[in-house]
Amino acid sequence: MNKKVILAAIEALELGETPVFTTEDVPAFSEDATRGNAHMSPASLDTIMASLTKADIPTLERAVRAIDDEELAWLGFKVVYDPALAVNNVDNAVTRKYGDVGSADGDPLLFFCNDAKEIVCSRPVSDRDVFQMKDVTRGPSMHNEQFEGLTWTSVALFEPVRVWLLGASDVAVELAKLATHVGFEVTVVDNDVAYLNERRFPDVERILLSTEDFSALDELTASPADYVCVLTRGHMYDPECCVWAERCNAHYVGMMGCAGKNGTVYEIVKASGLTDEQWEHIKRPIGLKFGAKTPAELAIAIVAELIDVRYIQRYDAEARERHERGLGRE
């Protein structure tokens, strides 16, 4: 979420005015995100913002600090659609118990929660509230319909990981959709508008190279935090893409293709100055191993690997082990 938007909200509250967050600021409340949801709509965001007072300023200030410190943190939103049900809801017969009362009150709420499960908000909350507030860190929501009368959602306060799809191949078409859906920022690069267009790649950044080949790729720069997937059509420009990704020092680089083809790519990239260490950094073949063959199946294998790389990047070994124990996967 944009820091300037949060600072503007703080200023509005200090002046006694109603702050404004739009659905562009909090996409979970957008028309597309709430379509078919009887309990949430763009108007729900307006209701929450109208309920805020000066007492909510510390919550927003904590969000600003989280952005400055690059924490894994979220602003969360409690949406109440039936106040009586919200405060009187009960645990179900399957999951663990979360106290003897429902939500602490029947009013909407803005709150802060980070990955360390620190919660900041303007009012007391119940144990059942805390359970659902912590779950927004798996966001934008998780188990949000477990208790009646209310629902929950959130917006991340950290930047998403950027994934470069080099090549507008059929696999890239499927991967762009999946990667966007699981929270990556996607950029697709190709040299042919017949393949790289809005119809095939809506809702992602598209960069059409200015040359007939991929030589203009050198005009672009990836961040060391970015992930690069080499998926060029017919593998024609895989060597150039591998060299570019390694020269950019991308965090993750993966290339599609069989061992025979990759051997040829190795000879070409070596001649271009790539070291053996850089070559070994490239995941070959890209994606998790589970028998994927079709473009859609390959995209699932790739995005699963990207999720795993992101997970390992964000959480240390102790945190990952604790998570696995909690799931019963020793």
Role assignments for model-derived ranges:
Residues 1-190, 198-204, 223-227, 309-330:
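Segments forming oxygen-rich coordination pockets for charged ligands
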Residues 175-178, 240-245:
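A short acidic, amphipathic alpha-helical/loop segment
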Residues 189, 227, 232-235, 243-268:
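ADP-ribose/adenylate-binding Rossmann-like module
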Residues 194-198, 262:
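Short alpha-helix immediately C-terminal to the canonical SAM-binding loop
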Residues 200-203, 236-237, 243:
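Cytosolic regulatory regions of ion transport systems
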Residues 205-211:
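Conserved SAM-binding strand-loop segment of SAM-dependent methyltransferases
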Residues 213-224:
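Short amphipathic alpha-helix with an adjacent loop that forms part of the alpha/beta core around
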Residues 256-330:
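Adenosine-phosphate binding glycine-rich loop
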